[in-house]
Amino acid sequence: VKVMETGSISIAAELLFITQPAVTKRIHSLEDYFGVKLFESAGRGIQPTHAAHSLLPKVKTWLNELGEIHHTLSHEQTQVQGRLKIGTSHHIGLHHLAEPLKKFVQLFPQVTLDVHFVDSEQAHEQVLAGELELAFLTLPPAGDDRLSYVTIWNDPLVFVSAPFHPLAKQTQLNLEDLIAYPSLLPAAQTYTSQITLSEFEKNGLKPKITMSNNPLESIRMLVSIGLGWSVLPKTFLNEDLKQLDLNLKMNRQLGMVWHPARIQSRAAEELIQLM
């Protein structure tokens, strides 16, 4: 599964904390067992065969079921232990999670915390698919009825530019003023971008998007050198950014999501309670 997800034996080995020869040996063992070729050489890399693509969804289902068996058995133990696989957006991981996770690992030293930095939208899908037990992310404007959400942090969004940008010198701006200048927004599928674009759509407007980028830290740098205006969390403001004088309040909700229909490990339950 890891080799198919990454397209690389070496990267898969790093993620699994084993050697490349060990990964190759396991692949050959699977090929011998099933009597089919799972990967073929392609230049300097490898590519999965049709058989591998056919096998992948069944393997993922089996891994999810195996994980639920582990979670069920964890409730029979008095000690909270085992591996807890969680996801977090880069922004939340860098700005909000350090202290809570530090407290968690001190309270439950027998738990191996497996933290994956992913985009909020990707984390949402991985929780839905059972690939993550729990994720910390920007909550979607419209949630999925199959998942449970808890808002933890309110994250105000502000319009920003470089201090020397023409918009920074103006007062009482409106959205019409902004569309005359290039904007730097997150990719259209991101929740932050959806929140921003919906405000323009309400007014029948469309911003002039010259560049879409992720993560937000990259956008902050591009804005600071004068390439355009953007919408960023208010916590990003510093001497390199100027909040634009626009009478419009926008917020995004940051929190956690999990799948209530799946059996939660005791470690996941404890982290949910801690948060």
What do these predicted ranges mean?
Residues 1-19:
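Short helix-boundary/capping micro-motifs
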Residues 31-48:
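A short LG(V/I)-centered, amphipathic sequence patch enriched
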Residues 33-34, 55-77:
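Alpha-helical linker/hinge and terminal dimerization helices associated
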Residues 81-142, 206-213:
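Central regulatory/effector-binding core of bacterial HTH transcription factors
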Residues 138, 182-203, 264-272:
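Secondary-structure junction motif
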Residues 144-151, 155, 217-263:
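Beta-alpha-beta core module
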Residues 146-183, 266-269:
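Flexible hinge/capping segments at coil-to-helix
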